[in-house]
């Protein structure tokens, strides 16, 4: 009995202590929250812009599974200049959007929680050393759509956790050596649309110090005439759209999974273009202004390719029967290819040696091709997928889907054209000869005429005039 009572007392005491600690903790949280709130207000609703559209939107979200607090601040489209911003960011800030303002330099902001900073669409023309060094937790930095042309060495110092760096649509040209070296875990780098980047002359990896383990690199519209990247760098995605490349660069990382080489100056796709792309699963050869031919074996080495697109390469008019390798292998080999697009090209026909390959596809896009629907192409009707290919010739089925046009309309002239010519010519010759013969046949024969003229029955025959015996009776 006594022991039960003491147990009850102990448990009561325990509950009390527990309650007390909870209460204290709560008070502490409330106090901290009050401090944050004041600080947040100072940043989000500054005195100078109270009750105007220039105040930022601040929202609390609970990020991460542990329910840590995180503050997202959206100050986009506010016409802010650098001097308008408070440099110390509120506690718990996670992301700050300063896009579409009028910042002409990057303010040296300070926060040890900020993960994402968006400065796109401002008027920043240069970065100075240590520009981001007080943002020690930064993971993503978006600096696209400015006019950054000058970067001091050390511009990216103090960003050991940065994973994504966007420098697209700027004016990068001469860059200090080892510029990117402080970015130890950088995974994605976008330098697209820096039209003078070809002048930088430095090798990205050894010269500019890009993280060896970079996985995504974008170099669209950088006026590149050639490119060498280390073969053994573990790069996964590379975009080289809209450059001045005449061949697919021979030396690219072996690990590439996705390559976009669209809108470059290739005229033909050759076997050496794809020879080293042994791991590529997605290959984009779109919008090529000059590409006319895909030569035999041009795509024979890309065994693991899943997606291939020639979309909108408007000069492309020849796809070799053996573009995907010798006929023998295409008919037996199981390829990984699932999606193939020739949309908007000038291809008229496909050799039936491609049938086994096309039959495996889950997607084949033939929209807008001027297809020549003759007996060579009738196999296309048998494909299990809808290609949206339409006949352009012959004229009587123009515009009809290959699948809905009648099979017997896909006919070929069994004789070659010159044979028709020959037949017509010989017909003309024959009838000429016939007419000649008829004319000759109808014309009176000279011998016959003479005989008739002087023959016995002819009125012109010789007559003998006998004397009139009645008038001279002797
Ligand atoms: C952008 O900066 C340049 C100088 O770098 C200046 O001449 C120009 O007026 C600025 N534009 C805006 C919209 O502030
Ligand atoms: C960069 O590209 C421009 C435009 O194509 C060209 O005029 C210039 O010579 C190139 N510079 C280098 C160093 O390749
Ligand atoms: C493939 O890569 C190797 C190693 O970089 C290179 O020597 C070779 O020329 C490349 N082959 C072709 C056909 O480009
Ligand atoms: C299709 O390709 C094979 C093998 O290259 C070739 O012999 C044949 O003539 C081609 N057919 C047509 C209609 O071009």
Predicted regions and their residues:
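Extracellular leucine-rich repeat
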Residues: 2-474
């Amino acid at each position: 009995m006594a022991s039960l009572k003491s147990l009850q007392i102990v448990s009561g005491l325990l509950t009390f202590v527990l309650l007390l600690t909870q209460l204290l903790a709560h008070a502490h949280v409330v106090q901290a929250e009050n401090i944050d709130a004041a600080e947040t207000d100072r940043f989000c609703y500054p005195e100078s812009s109270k009750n105007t559209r220039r105040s930022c939107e601040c929202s609390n979200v609970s990020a991460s599974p542990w329910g840590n607090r995180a503050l997202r601040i959206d100050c986009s489209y506010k016409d802010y200049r650098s001097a308008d911003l408070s440099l110390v960011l509120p506690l718990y800030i996670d992301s700050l959007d300063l896009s579409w303002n009028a910042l002409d330099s990057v303010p040296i902001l300070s926060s040890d929680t900020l993960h994402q900073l968006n400065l796109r669409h401002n008027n920043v023309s240069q970065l100075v050393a240590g520009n981001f060094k007080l943002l020690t937790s930064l993971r993503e930095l978006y600096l696209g759509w400015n006019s950054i042309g000058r970067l001091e060495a050390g511009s990216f110092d103090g960003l050991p956790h940065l994973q994504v760096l966007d420098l697209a649509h700027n004016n990068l040209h001469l860059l200090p050596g080892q510029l990117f070296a402080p970015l130890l875990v950088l995974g994605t780098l976008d330098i697209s649309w820096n039209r003078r980047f070809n002048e930088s002359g430095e090798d990205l990896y050894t010269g500019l110090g890009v993280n060896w383990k970079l996985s995504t690199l974008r170099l669209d519209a950088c006026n590149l005439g050639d490119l060498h990247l280390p073969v053994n760098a573990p790069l996964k995605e590379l975009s080289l759209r809209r450059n001045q490349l005449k061949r697919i660069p021979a030396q690219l990382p072996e690990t590439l999974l996705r390559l976009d080489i669209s809108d470059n100056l290739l005229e033909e796709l050759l076997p050496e273009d794809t020879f080293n792309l042994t791991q590529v699963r997605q290959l984009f050869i779109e919008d090529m202004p000059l590409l006319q031919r895909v030569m035999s074996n041009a795509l024979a080495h890309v065994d693991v390719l899943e997606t291939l697109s020639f979309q909108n390469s408007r000069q492309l008019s020849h796809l070799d029967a053996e573009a995907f390798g010798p006929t023998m292998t295409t008919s037996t080999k199981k390829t990984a290819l699932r999606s193939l697009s020739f949309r908007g090209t000038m291809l008229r026909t496909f050799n039936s040696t491609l049938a086994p390959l096309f039959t495996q596809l889950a997607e084949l896009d033939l929209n807008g091709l001027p297809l020549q629907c003759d007996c060579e192409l009738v196999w296309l009707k048998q494909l299990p997928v809808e290609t949206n290919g339409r006949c352009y010739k012959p004229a009587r089925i123009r515009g009809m889907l290959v699948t809905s046009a009648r099979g017997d309309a896909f006919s070929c002239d069994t004789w070659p054209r010159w044979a028709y010519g020959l037949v017509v010519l010989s017909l003309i010759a024959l009838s000429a000869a016939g007419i000649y013969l008829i004319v000759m046949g109808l014309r009176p024969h000279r011998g016959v005429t003479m005989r008739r003229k002087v023959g016995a029955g002819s009125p012109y025959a010789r007559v003998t005039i006998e004397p009139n015996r009645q008038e001279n009776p002797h």
